[in-house]
Amino acid sequence: MAAFARMVKGQVRNYSAPLDMAIPASKQKYIPSSGSYPKGFLVSGTHVGVKASNTKFPDLALISSETPCSAAAVFTTNKFQAAPVQVSKKTLESRQGQGIRSVVINSGCANAVTGKGGLEDAVSMGKKVDECNGLSEPSTIVMSTGVIGQRLPISKILNKIPTAHENLASTHDAWLTTARAICTTDTFPKLLSRTFVLPSSPGRTYSLAGMTKGAGMIHPNMATLLGVLCTDAPIDPSALQSLLTHAVSRSFNSISVDGDTSTNDTVAILANGAAGGAPISSPASDDYTAMQDILTSFAQSLSQLVVRDGEGATKFVTVRVQNSPDYESARLIASTIARSPLVKTALYGRDANWGRILCAIGYTQGVAPGTVVPERTSVSFKPVDGSPVLKLLVNGEPEQVDEERASVILQEEDLEIVVDLGGGEKGEQGLGGEEAVYWFCDFSHEYVTINGDYRT
């Protein structure tokens, strides 16, 4: 048995982060070679050695604005909220979403379920950053990620925060290094940026950047994993909170890797207004509507990178539930399918076992009465190459499935599952009803290996 354990821990992993942190060739395509970053934001990634085994890689991220920001965040609903979650919520509440200057993040230790001492550690991290910024009031959001139930090596972190502050920069390399600093079992840093315009200022260009981490313990409930977004657009705090909540509900709250909701889940956004223009404040304004679409689309792209880096994952799966009487029922059904171990393992095995999908639909809890009617439910696979859908079930009646074509479809990395609650031709034409989309990955042997020796 001991020999077997040594063999497992020494084996070559195809999908998890290599010991030298080199980005796998298959994931290189997700790494941006340049970016359009918001004005007035500076970032750095610094090595601390939070985990003793980490002797050289960055594990402390610092994101700072040269001017005070409006800020908003959504946090985990896990009852065991980590110390940084509790501290950051208090900071945002006391500041009413105004005057925030920085976000500091350590990887390697979650600082969760660590008692009074853990709370003191989280406070001290934020306070140290504030001191570096010459501030006396709490103005920093704190995040941590890693192993639960262990105290931070807080002295090491506090000693390196001034170094992180000195190294702040606005270059693409700095942003990429910062994104790498928040990774744990991730195989690649997740960083995106884009420019946009608003209806009130068509000649003014704004920028939006975001980084996220996560590969396991991913299933949302108000927020998921860690994410930081920054924009130089001017947005009032109350509007920023509603914009983020909407965006997260349709992005970070619509992904699943393994069905576990972390103790540390936090997604935050900072808006410093450095690009000028009139502040976005009223939900009735054209600028608000445009910003909602921009932020939601951006958050979806960012959150999908987490699924593509799911621990041991070999597939990126979109499940689209359409023709539902309401959005929430469609979302619940999509979520149930996405977290079904039987669905996920069938996809890994390239098995077109649509009965597992139907089973998940049938046991979904909380949907509106009359949402799921077997006689009008249809399920199909939609290939990524644009070829016709492969019908599996139509109006509750099984189709004669072309197993050979199904196998070809399931060999692809990307796949879409379409569930039509209205049935048949009506659903295919997209007539009527609400639609929800969820993104998830498969379960492989590698997932068990990664999580079986996570702490070692």
Swiss-Prot record:
Entry superkingdom: Eukaryota
One record GO biological process: L-arginine biosynthetic process
Gene3D superfamilies to which the protein is assigned, alphabetical: arginine biosynthesis bifunctional protein suprefamily, ArgJ beta chain, C-terminal domain, L-amino peptidase D-ALA esterase/amidase
E.C. designation(s): 2.3.1.35, 2.3.1.1
Catalytic function, reaction form: N(2)-acetyl-L-ornithine + L-glutamate = N-acetyl-L-glutamate + L-ornithine; L-glutamate + acetyl-CoA = N-acetyl-L-glutamate + CoA + H(+)
Site (Cleavage): A223, T224
Post-translational modification: The alpha and beta chains are autoproteolytically processed from a single precursor protein within the mitochondrion.
Key word Acyltransferase present: yes
Pfam family for this entry, one: ArgJ
Binding-site positions, substrate: T184, K213, T224, E311, N451, T456
Sites marked Involved in the stabilization of negative charge on the oxyanion by the formation of the oxyanion hole: T145, G146
Entry's localization field: Mitochondrion matrix
GO CC list: mitochondrial matrix
Role of this protein: Catalyzes two activities which are involved in the cyclic version of arginine biosynthesis: the synthesis of acetylglutamate from glutamate and acetyl-CoA, and of ornithine by transacetylation between acetylornithine and glutamate.
Family: Belongs to the ArgJ family.
Note: This protein may be expected to contain an N-terminal transit peptide but none has been predicted.
Protein name (Swiss-Prot/TrEMBL): Arginine biosynthesis bifunctional protein ArgJ, mitochondrial
